[in-house]
Regions:
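Short connector loops at helix/strand junctions that flank enzyme active sites
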Residues: 82, 103, 127-128
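Amphipathic, small/basic residue-rich leader segments at the start of a protein or domain
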Residues: 1-100
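Short alpha-helical scaffold segments that flank and stabilize functional sites
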Residues: 17, 24, 64, 106-112, ...
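N-terminal glycine-rich flavin-associated loop
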Residues: 36, 97-116
Length: 145
């Protein structure tokens, strides 16, 4: 069995990124702010603004966090998976309501595709397009085959 690294691949760059994310989310996602944002309207039909703050999302984009693992050839930064993990962990600690995790999931799925349309989608993600996945069976249905 291969021994796993004790730091799970976190190098100096990833540690600095994690520290920056921790500070960003502490400064911008206090429990009171998050509660005020999402708890005032429990309806499933509430407007998107009550679910996630688009101006805060734009700051995440400007910090390069949506592009952190996207290859440089597609407009990203090209860091390893642990860079996204560092950001995602801090986002989760603060209960940051956003499409960040779904965007990361889409990013890694698209990276595995390595096609022109996938690379175009990666470039869109790198510039701030919030993204998610829709997975269907071979017939295009959500139901089991």
């Amino acid at each position: 069995m291969t021994e796993q690294p004790k730091n799970f691949g976190f190098g100096e760059d990833e540690t600095m990124l994690k520290d920056a994310a921790q500070k960003f989310f502490a400064d911008n996602c206090s429990p009171d702010k998050i509660h005020g944002q999402v708890a005032h309207d429990p309806s499933i039909h509430r407007p998107i603004e009550s679910i996630w703050d688009k101006s805060l999302w734009q700051q995440v984009v400007e910090l390069g966090w949506t592009a952190v693992c996207i290859p440089e050839a597609a407009g990203g930064i090209g860091m390893p998976l642990v860079a996204a993990v560092a950001i995602a962990e801090e986002a989760g600690k603060s209960a940051f309501p956003s499409p960040l995790i779904s965007t990361y999931c889409a990013t890694f799925t698209l990276m595995a595709c390595d096609t022109d349309p996938a690379n175009k989608a990666l470039a869109d993600i790198a510039t701030g397009t919030a993204t998610t996945l829709a997975i269907t069976n071979e017939k295009g249905s959500w139901e089991s085959a």
